[in-house]
């Protein structure tokens, strides 16, 4: 816990301990569980209930939000009824005692999804989550009017970091610019019909799923970038090569993609109208690829900074792989007609 200045003192404060029903004196032990690019997670066992819990410390916001941890907690509360996401137990984004937002949630069982053997288990998991009705009065979740345009604008912001950096490769700057131009051209040719909207995750990497097996509860964690939007945006992200290749070396075949969409539509059943899901998913996949590439370009520059709080060696290696010209040329194939 020494990595986060003040965290050891934070978990001893009265408000935190009373809210979670912890003894006045700290008895629990916090162990580093995992870290992403914007959060560090610690696991601990509640000394009174014996339940395993997760302490999440927020270190940044992809969405440039002032209240990132509250936003994530709000989304989790909205979809708690799905039974496929962690229950929020405590949230503090005040930053009065600690310079970071803090979230405590239940610890869920399971292992990271294996694309080769467990791909289809993600379909009913997503269907459960997407089927949760969001109240009409909901105003906190961000709701882009034009999701494809919103993704491309985000891509432009991220690419700008690489483009303006003297560390960036000039050939790659030119090539990524060409890919973005293809993305804008493709977006102009696509008209997504408005339809069912729900809370979507937008970050469906294999490690964000906790798999327990067929006939058991499988979960989706890591809700730092949720939106109110088209469920096909989640499918497009989940199936895109820039997603599957991230933590593995898997790129799904066209047949695997179609089978997954079939399984998802079947899992949805009559809970909401899913007749346009396939068409919309294929509209999101190539644009999602651009998001993956431009995020890697931005992150590559950030990883050159000596004061970066979170540094993942495996991530740095993947950043270089995604910016390899052969990989970029492969992505071009998804953007060209």
Regions found by a protein language model. Give the residues of each.
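Active-site acidic catalytic loop and adjacent metal/ATP-binding pocket
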Residues: 33-46, 50, 54-55, 184-233
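ATP/Mg2+ or Mg2+-diphosphate-binding catalytic cores
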Residues: 292-337
